[in-house]
Amino acid sequence: MLIGEKSIEENKKKMLERKEVYKQYGYDQDASRNFILEKSLPLRLPILEIGTGKGHMTALLAKQGVKVITVDNSLADQEFARLNVAAEKVLDSVRFALFDAAQLPYPDQGFGTVVSVNAFHHFEKPFAVLGEMIRVCREKIVIADFNQEGFEIIRKLHRDEGHEHEEKCGDFSLVGQYLKGYDFAVKKHDGCHQVVYVGERKK
């Protein structure tokens, strides 16, 4: 799909304006994503991302000089993501896939690193998705979501804009124990409004 430069620039302007809104509420999106990336390194190849969203983490991963397959069930979100990834000049490094993350079409242990950022609270069946992440992961899983302070900021911003932030019922605090149950060594990191679980499959 060809993307025009005008569309890329218009979207980038809106994205930068949105980042400033978040900063006014005390949430630095770039610092948050860089915190997650730092805890994710070194990345094991190939890389699968679960939950493309608007493509911000997708682009950051691809900017590390690696190829990324990113999965989402929303075509609309992936169209926005293409614009954001294109703005970062890494579109050729990203393959977009439209699938239900609870039923991935990939082979067992087919990916060196499986990443999911700020998507867990949106999943209808979060532990079915986590189970699929475990199945297709050969070495490392990185799964991050907002910490309590982060959620409070996001909820307030959305309320101030006249709507509620969508959150499903998954208990993110169980993720670490769940990974350990599948023989992963797990580290938990809390900072920059994020909780990040990094699980490495034991040899």
Q: Which role does the model predict for each range below?
A:
Residues 127-141:
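A short glycine-rich, Lys/Arg-flanked "PGG" loop and its adjoining helix->strand segment in the class I
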Residues 115:
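A conserved beta-strand element that flanks and buttresses the S-adenosyl-L-methionine
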Residues 19-26, 57-59, 71, 142-198:
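C-terminal alpha-helical "lid/dimerization" subdomain adjacent to the S-adenosyl-L-methionine
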Residues 54-103:
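Class I SAM-dependent methyltransferase SAM/SAH-binding core
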Residues 119-122:
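A short His-aromatic
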Residues 1-42, 44-53:
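Conserved class I S-adenosyl-L-methionine
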Residues 46, 67, 95, 110-112:
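Structural signature of beta-strand start/N-cap positions in the alpha/beta core
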